[in-house]
């Protein structure tokens, strides 16, 4: 699953749709972790959509990632500021790719 310490153990390598991206990244095979409040490990995400369905405040939006070995799209936490910390996304993710931490 996602490294719960990624916010301190990984380097911020960029920004995407208003949230930080934690490396390493080497597209299209290695995409890193997107988000700080709601972190999604793009390298673990298999795009089953359970987090998108479970989230009551629409934190996630599909983002196309052609060529990635795990899936061709990812649940991108573009509205992480809206998170109400219900942990629904964390609880339903089949590959434990999400970590939520209040700011």
Curated annotation (Swiss-Prot):
Transmembrane segments: none annotated. It comes from Acidianus ambivalens. GO terms for molecular function: 3 iron, 4 sulfur cluster binding; 4 iron, 4 sulfur cluster binding; electron transfer activity; oxidoreductase activity; zinc ion binding. Residues 37-65, 74-103 form the 4Fe-4S ferredoxin-type domain. This is Zinc-containing ferredoxin. The modification N6-methyllysine is found at residues 29, 101. Gene3D superfamilies: 3.30.70.20. Ferredoxins are iron-sulfur proteins that transfer electrons in a wide variety of metabolic reactions. The 3Fe-4S cluster is reduced by a flavoprotein with NADH oxidase activity from the same organism. Zn(2+) binds at residues 16, 19, 34, 76. Its cofactor is [3Fe-4S] cluster; [4Fe-4S] cluster; Zn(2+). It holds the Pfam family Fer4_10. The gene is zfx. Binds 1 [3Fe-4S] cluster. Binds 1 [4Fe-4S] cluster. The keyword Manganese does not apply. [4Fe-4S] cluster binds at residues 55, 83, 86, 89. [3Fe-4S] cluster binds at residues 45-46, 51, 93.
């Amino acid at each position: 699953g996602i490294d719960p310490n990624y916010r301190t153990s990984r380097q911020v390598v960029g920004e995407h749709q208003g949230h930080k991206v934690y490396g390493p990244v080497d597209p299209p095979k290695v995409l890193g972790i997107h988000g700080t409040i709601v972190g999604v490990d793009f390298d673990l995400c298999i795009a089953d959509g359970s987090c998108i369905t479970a989230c009551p405040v629409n934190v996630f939006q599909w983002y196309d990632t052609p060529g990635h070995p795990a899936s061709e799209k990812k649940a991108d936490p573009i509205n992480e500021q809206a998170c109400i910390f219900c942990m629904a996304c964390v609880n339903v993710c089949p590959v434990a790719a999400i970590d939520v931490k209040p700011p």
